[in-house]
Structure formats: structure tokens, C-alpha cells
């Protein structure tokens, strides 16, 4: 089973993917996580990504993104492992590249208002150890400023600051909205109301998967 979650930053793709992988035999493929892992390396690819200023809200070029995503997806397909794509593809060129080697079974579009996105993104804090995500508005840690899992001090990513969020949403409107139009004629395309709580978004998707196996 090959699932795509598509939607703007802050729509809940990561959180929903986490819930789906926890309760199903699915692997979570997040380009954000893949890039963060690469940035820890001393490699030419890491240096290229750093030069792009991802932390300032800029998107990595399609050529690099396709290379990184294909490497991860090819391995899963080779092992016949079901997976969820989160954050890829996000442009028409990326979608066309993906279609060359991967047929998606479900395309879930997380539809959400911009006002709700700003609230979610600027209120988001992250654990440096386990990558757990919290939000000061609706997913607070048990102890202020500390991760529930490992008690590490939470931090706010540079791309979750207000200025960077505005850039990310502008980039999304310009590059990813055309992708929605590309997919919405596909019979596997399902629109989900992502303004509701993450748990409800997850339940809607999980129920759909159960009913349409």
C-alpha cells in the first residue's frame, strides 16, 4: 500500500503519518526528516542543501529532492513495504518524477485554512532527541518546555518563526496548489477537512483505509 499525504506545512501530515504508522504496518517517508538526517553528514549533498537556506523557508530544488526521495522509496518498494509519503511530492515536476516508478494507492489532501496554519506553525516546538512535536495551543507537553518522552529541552525550529512561515506558505501557494489540481481528477484523490483536531483527521483517514482495502 502506497499512500500520499499532501497539504501545506502545519496541516498535520507528520502527526497523522505518525498515528497511521503506529497503528498499521506502514513506514513513514518524510522528506523533512530525510533532509535533516543528511544535514548532519559531512557530505557534498549536505553542503548544497545548507546553501539553499532551508531554515529560512526556501524549498530544496526538485533535482535534489527527487534524488533523495527516490533512494528512500526504491528501498521500500524493493522490500515490498507499505509506506506513507509526507512532504513529497510538492511540485508538478516531483509528481511526474514519482509517477515514473511508483503508483500511488491513495492520495489524501489535507485541506486547511491559512489562519489555522499560522496558529499551528508559529506555536510548534520540537524535541531535539526524538523529534517529537508539541504545540502551545493544543498539544502542550506535560512539563512546560520539556519533552514527555525524554525530558529534553524543546526548541522552535527556525522555519517555524513567523517570517519563515509566511515564506513557506507563499512557496506552497505558488508551487503546490497546482499539484492539487494535477491530482484532484485522480480517482484515488480524497479531500480531508484538516481544520479539525489531528485525532479526527487520523480517524477519517484510517476509517477510509479500512473500508476501502
UniProtKB/Swiss-Prot annotation:
The keyword Cytoplasm applies. AMP binds at residues 31, 36, 58-60, 87-90, 94, 157, 168. Residues 30-60 are annotated as: NMP. Its EC number is 2.7.4.3. It is found in: Cytoplasm. Coiled coil: none annotated. Monomer. This is Adenylate kinase. It comes from Ureaplasma parvum serovar 3 (strain ATCC 700970).
Amino acid at each position: 500500500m502506497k499512500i500520499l499525504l499532501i497539504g501545506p506545512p502545519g496541516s498535520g501530515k507528520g502527526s497523522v503519518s505518525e498515528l497511521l504508522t503506529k497503528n498499521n504496518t506502514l513506514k513513514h517517508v518524510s522528506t523533512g526528516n530525510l533532509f535533516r538526517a543528511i544535514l548532519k553528514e559531512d557530505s557534498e549533498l549536505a553542503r548544497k542543501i545548507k546553501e539553499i537556506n532551508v531554515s529560512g523557508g526556501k524549498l530544496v530544488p526538485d533535482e535534489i529532492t527527487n534524488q533523495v526521495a527516490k533512494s528512500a522509496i526504491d528501498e521500500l518498494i524493493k522490500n515490498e513495504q507499505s509506506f506513507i509519503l509526507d512532504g513529497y511530492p510538492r511540485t508538478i515536476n516531483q509528481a511526474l518524477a514519482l509517477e515514473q516508478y511508483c503508483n500511488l494507492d491513495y492520495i489524501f489532501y489535507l485541506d486547511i485554512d491559512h489562519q489555522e496554519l499560522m496558529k499551528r506553525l508559529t506555536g510548534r516546538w520540537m524535541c531535539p532527541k526524538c523529534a517529537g512535536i508539541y504545540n502551545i495551543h493544543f498539544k502542550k507537553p506535560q512539563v512546560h518546555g520539556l519533552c514527555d518522552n525524554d525530558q529534553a529541552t524543546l526548541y522552535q525550529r527556525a522555519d517555524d518563526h513567523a517570517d519563515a512561515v509566511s515564506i513557506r506558505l507563499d512557496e506552497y501557494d505558488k508551487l503546490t496548489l497546482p499539484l492539487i489540481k494535477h491530482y484532484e481528477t485522480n480517482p484515488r484523490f480524497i479531500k480531508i477537512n484538516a481544520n479539525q483536531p489531528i485525532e479526527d483527521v487520523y480517524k477519517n483517514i484510517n476509517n477510509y483505509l479500512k473500508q476501502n482495502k
